[in-house]
Amino acid sequence: MIDQGRISVLSEEGDYLLVDKPLDWTSFDVVAKIRGAYKRNGAKRKVGHCGTLDPKATGLLILATGRKTKTISSLELLDKAYEGTIRLGAKTVSHDTESEEYDLRDVPSLDERAIREAATSMIGERMQQPPMHSAVWHNGKRLYELARQGHEVKERKARQIEIHQFEITGIELPYVHFYIRVSKGAYIRVIAHELGELLGVGGYLKSLKRVAIGQYQLSDAMSVDAVVDEITRAASVIEE
């Protein structure tokens, strides 16, 4: 008997694949890997993704295959939830670990209550300017490309975002652990930087894991290798 769950990954109608993106992979690296697996198994399929994750972030990435790629825009409207760690008392130009620390400060005098209240004060709608180290387009180039060339675009258009929930889950100074749920288009790196500014000591995003996109959960995701294996198994079942 053919396992319909297995062959669904080869359906021309397409499907959503929930993938746990590894550290240091770009979102396109994941797409390319899955697209290559289809091609090697004789099944050319369109593959796209919803909600870019930075290379230094891990967690849930939704891939759409086949005709499902036409529905990606609807998925991008969904709220996203993350768990992560902010390093207080230091800054980086990228607001994460992609660049070197500077402006280091001692933070032993920071009050835990003040940290939690600062996070709570950020909940709600706010305008957010995309960071230079981002995939936003400017005059035909990505901002991160310009940043790597040493250029800064000061007139980056701010966008309205909403922080629905921002909970501090642990404090081990200089590190602060958090859970956050945000609207489409929010940069968690910028939120980490802004929290550091509110506290007067600076801060950057040390680590980040996306745990949910709308109703889709990281707990239901597969590793990249597991998805590749599933495509290979499905192809072998059909050949039999």
From Swiss-Prot:
Gene3D superfamilies: Pseudouridine synthase. Keywords: Isomerase, tRNA processing. It catalyses: uridine(55) in tRNA = pseudouridine(55) in tRNA. Pfam families: TruB_C_2, TruB_N. Transmembrane segments: none annotated. The keyword tRNA processing applies. SUPFAM superfamilies: Pseudouridine synthase (SSF55120). GO terms for biological process: mRNA pseudouridine synthesis; tRNA pseudouridine synthesis. Its EC number is 5.4.99.25. One of its GO terms (molecular function) is tRNA pseudouridine(55) synthase activity. InterPro entries: PsdUridine_synth_cat_dom_sf, PsdUridine_synth_N, tRNA_psdUridine_synth_TruB, TruB_C. The active site is at residue 54. Belongs to the pseudouridine synthase TruB family. Type 1 subfamily. Responsible for synthesis of pseudouridine from uracil-55 in the psi GC loop of transfer RNAs. NCBIfam families: TruB. This is tRNA pseudouridine synthase B. It comes from Chlorobaculum tepidum (strain ATCC 49652 / DSM 12025 / NBRC 103806 / TLS) (Chlorobium tepidum). The lineage of its organism: Bacteria, Pseudomonadati, Chlorobiota, Chlorobiia, Chlorobiales. The gene is truB.
